Design a protein with these regions (language model features):
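Hydrophobic face of amphipathic alpha-helices that form TPR/SEL1-like repeat modules
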Residues: 46-55, 84-91, 130, 162-167, ...
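Helix-start (N-cap) detector for alpha-helical repeat units in TPR-like alpha-solenoids
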Residues: 43-44, 79-81, 187-189, 229-231
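Short coil/turn and helix-start
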Residues: 39, 57-61, 75, 91-97, ...
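TPR/TPR-like (Sel1-like) alpha-helical repeat modules
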Residues: 100-114
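Bacterial N-terminal signal peptides
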Residues: 1-8
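Boundary at the C-terminal end of the N-terminal hydrophobic targeting segment
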Residues: 13-17
Length: 242
């Protein structure tokens, strides 16, 4: 079960079909609109605003603004944003590096219902954030980062999904981020998009899971045509097996 952070302001819409419209809707919210929301939904909306501004999804990229949204989200119960702020201060993303601030916000994360000890929270978050930092500074590392997220998020129990959501990652966000990055034409990202589609990280095929496989083939074919060996092997296995 995936914990999906993007809760719409008016009504919940299929994110895989309406992301662009939703991003515009979020970006148009005023602080007054946000303040009028119930606390949990407000935190989720602020987290979503942080996400789209962090990566420039439907809005201009603005890491400084993203950090402010994440900070606000973190202060509303610790379910969202706290580890995003930790990352920013730890790696100097949109702000000067500050280990004290990084630790301060990490401690604000809500630990309720997390079936994982602090030692492993630190270990797993650090591994993912190291990969994220590489992807943030080197486009050639983006596909590897998405692959790590697929491994972390695919077919996990609810408790694991909750943990990864608390530190800033879920299936829907991973799909949206990979979709954005796939526009650069990286063959390896085409392959990762095939994996994401096959495993329905978008949630689009929840009611029709049999549609995910054919939808993924266009990505695998694109990757194979560009020389990605893993995609070529996968398609070879599919075609040889009928």
């Amino acid at each position: 079960l995936c914990i999906v952070a993007g809760i719409l302001f008016v009504s919940q819409v299929n994110a895989s079909e309406n992301n662009g419209k939703d991003d515009v809707k979020y970006a148009a919210l005023t602080q007054k609109d946000i303040d009028a929301l119930p606390v949990e939904k407000r935190a989720s909306v602020l987290d979503e605003l942080g996400f789209i501004h962090e990566y420039g999804i439907g809005v201009p990229m603005n890491r400084e603004q993203a950090l402010q949204y994440y900070k606000q989200a973190c202060e509303l119960g610790g379910n969202y944003g706290c580890y995003n702020v930790k990352y920013a201060y730890q790696y100097g993303d949109g702000v000067a590096k500050d280990s004290a601030q990084a630790n301060k916000y990490a401690k604000k994360m809500n630990l309720d219902n997390l079936l994982i000890e602090q030692e492993y929270i630190d270990k797993f978050s650090q591994e993912i954030y190291m990969a994220k930092a590489l992807a943030d500074t080197d486009k050639s590392q983006r596909a590897a980062f998405i692959s790590i997220l697929i491994h972390a998020l695919n077919n996990r129990p609810e408790s694991d999904a909750l943990f990864f959501s608390r530190i800033g990652f879920n299936q829907e966000k991973t799909f949206r981020l990979a979709t954005l990055w796939s526009q650069d034409g990286d063959p390896q990202m085409d392959y990762q998009m095939g994996r994401l589609t096959l495993n329905d990280f978008s949630g689009r095929y929840a009611d029709e899971p049999y549609q995910a496989r054919p939808a993924s083939l266009k990505w695998f074919r694109a990757a194979a045509e560009k020389g990605v060996v893993e995609a070529q092997s996968l398609l070879g296995g599919i075609y040889s097996g009928g």
